Regions:
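Alpha-helix C-terminal capping segments
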Residues: 137-148, 171-173, 191-197, 215-217, ...
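N-terminal Rossmann-like NAD(P)+-binding subdomain of aldehyde/semialdehyde dehydrogenases
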Residues: 1-118
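Short acidic-hydrophobic, aromatic-tinged amphipathic segments that line or gate anion-handling sites
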Residues: 1-7, 177-182, 302-307
Length: 423
């Protein structure tokens, strides 16, 4: 990893992400979207054969296929998926917002009610690996929110099937339908609907540059969660941290993707050097060594600051997807953090705990998005309409406020809706 002194760097340049240029594929993706919108299932099958190398007759996964997946899945993985689902469910139930009302003034009651959206689509990536955990993280919050129809889409394997773990995870999470389609064409199917794939109101879940571009283009016709990019971690630590623990977290992030970003920010030069030594040692024996080395060569940095205040400033400026805090007083350090997708406190809270089963969601904002967005949650699938109820006396009192403003703005019919009721 590159070791840098805070006093000698251009911070903005140092923390700049390696970017996927979504714009360069927009024309290609736009053509895919338009083709699917026009030709529906035929276009879906065309692109599945072209990009995935497989011909799919029935896009929808059958009940028999799900039952077969249960029969062949390793028992220990089944138990693990069920336990992870239970933890995720517990956490996301606490996120359900409350309905409430208050008396703003005598005779004027206003409040909030809670209603789920009707349908959601969950994109589950294929490619380098299968991610049953991503199904749990996207489907469970939607079902807890009360979404009636939750649809999963995921690329088929070369044999035309979906991996057993994906099907079982979708069933455990409560997915209503699963379709054998990936890429931009899957997003198009969810956004516009086809003969097989239902149109949904919101699309969530990470994907490659083509999926990201497709979500960007259909946004406004359907909702999406937030822009997604390469995975990232920032570790904020002092000399009390265990350098070997930190090294394992750096490698855990780096093995995701060659474009993953890994930062250690510390006021301890000794910790910086020891952590880097462990990173080098562990990389040599890592099964995904090539990916890790490429990732760290691109975006693996250790920044040594003079003070923890400087380290905290760097952290908030970077706004990491994942933030590990390993300091003498983690809660005190946490009180100064404003920008992070998900935060892991102390020596025994690796990012992987949140990835799989601590209960929090691992679909998180990247690329500095944590300055503006929160991670995926139950609330992402919920609307909160406001409600008001006025008595005649309340309306009369409110007219003293509303009528002058309405007339000043030139909305005389607005003002008249008060006056008529108060005759």
């Amino acid at each position: 990893m590159e070791i840098l002194n805070y006093s000698e760097i251009d911070l903005a340049e140092t923390i700049k992400r390696s970017e996927e240029d979504v714009n360069k594929v927009l024309d290609i993706v736009s053509d895919i979207l338009n083709n699917v919108k026009l030709n529906k299932d035929d276009a879906i099958r065309e692109y599945t054969e072209k990009f995935d190398g497989v011909t799919i007759e029935n896009l929808k996964v059958s009940k028999d296929e799900i039952e077969e997946a249960y029969d062949t899945l390793d028992d220990s993985l089944l138990v693990a998926l069920k336990q992870a689902a239970s933890n995720i469910e517990k956490f996301h139930k606490k996120q359900i917002p409350s309905e409430w009302e208050l008396e703003v003034n005598p005779g004027i009651v206003a409040g909030q009610i809670v209603r789920p959206i009707n349908s959601a689509g969950c994109y589950i990536p294929g490619g380098r690996a299968a991610y049953p955990s991503s199904i749990l993280m996207t489907v469970i919050p939607a079902k807890i929110a009360g979404v009636k129809k939750v649809v999963c889409v995921t690329p088929p394997q070369k044999d035309g099937k979906i991996l057993d773990a994906i099907l079982v995870a979708a069933d455990i999470a409560g997915a209503d339908e699963i379709y054998k389609v990936g890429g931009a064409q899957a997003i198009a199917g969810l956004a516009y609907g086809t003969e097989s794939i239902p149109r949904v109101e919101k699309i969530v879940g990470p994907g490659n540059i083509f999926v990201t571009a497709a979500k960007k283009l259909v946004y406004g016709q359907v909702d999406i969660e937030f822009p997604a990019g390469p995975s990232e971690v920032l570790i904020l630590a002092d000399d009390s941290a265990n350098p070997e623990f930190l090294a394992t977290d750096i490698l855990a992030q780096a093995e995701h993707d060659p474009n993953a970003s890994c930062f250690l920010v510390t006021d301890s030069k000794d910790l910086a050097i020891k952590t880097d030594e462990f990173v080098n040692q562990l990389t040599q024996i890592a099964p995904r060594r090539e990916i890790i080395e490429e990732s760290l060569s691109k975006s693996g940095k250790i920044i040594i600051t003079n003070t923890m205040d400087e380290a905290i400033y760097v952290t908030n400026e970077y706004a990491p997807e994942h933030l590990i805090i390993s300091t003498k007083d983690d809660d005190e350090t946490l009180s100064h953090i404003n920008n992070a997708g998900s935060i892991f406190l102390g020596s025994y809270s690796p990012v992987a705990a949140g990835d799989y089963g601590s209960g929090t969601n691992h679909v998180l904002p990247t690329g500095g998005g944590a300055k503006m967005y929160s991670g995926l949650s139950t609330e992402a699938f919920i609307k909160k309409p406001t409600v008001q109820r006025l008595t005649k006396e309340g309306l009369k009192e409110l007219s003293k406020t509303s009528v002058p403003i309405a007339e000043y703005e030139g909305f005389f019919a607005h003002a008249n809706s008060f006056k008529t009721r108060l005759k």
